[in-house]
């Protein structure tokens, strides 16, 4: 992750996001939040709520993690996902990881997270994330990669992976 672009398995590239990625990132957010499509209202109104929620997430990340690094995941030059991380003093935090629907279930998330784990192993630093209880699929993926539940409440769990050695 420290390189300007890190090559992952199967032609994946994780590169820093650019201002021109805004439309892709907003569209990706919409696909990652199907719950927002259940809002009762005109489609235009729903789109406005999705856009507002995207801005709230972006601002919240900026306020809480001002040094966060934002990446776009590409497969053979096509944007397929996004990753946001924060390299804190005691841990690397995975703040956001999402993929377009067509890229889900292909092992790309695993490859990206293994890249984060490799970077953490090199600096002997744990990796932490928060997974909402409404996302059991993500929870299973993190647990399969060796993350363990460190804190839990009815809404979310804090999962942490510790480097070996």
Segments the model singles out, each with a brief description of its role:
Residues 110, 134-155:
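Conserved active-site alpha-helix within GNAT-family acetyltransferase domains
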Residues 33-60:
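Conserved GNAT-fold acetyl-CoA-binding loop/helix
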């Amino acid at each position: 992750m420290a390189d300007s672009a890190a090559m992952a398995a199967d032609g994946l590239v994780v590169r820093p996001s650019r201002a021109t990625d805004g439309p892709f990132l907003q569209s990706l957010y919409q696909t990652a939040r199907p719950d927002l499509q259940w809002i009762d209202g005109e489609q235009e109104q729903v789109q406005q709520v999705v856009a507002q929620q995207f801005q709230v997430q972006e601002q919240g990340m900026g306020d809480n993690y001002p040094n966060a690094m934002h990446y776009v995941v590409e497969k053979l030059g096509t944007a397929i996902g996004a990753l946001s991380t924060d390299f804190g003093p005691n841990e690397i935090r995975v703040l956001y990881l999402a993929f377009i629907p067509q890229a889900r279930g292909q092992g790309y998330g695993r490859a990206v997270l293994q890249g984060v784990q490799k970077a953490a192993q090199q600096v002997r630093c744990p990796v932490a994330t928060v997974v909402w209880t409404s996302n059991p699929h993500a929870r299973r993926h993190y647990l399969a990669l060796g993350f363990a539940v460190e804190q839990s409440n009815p809404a979310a769990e804090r999962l942490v992976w510790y480097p070996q050695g």
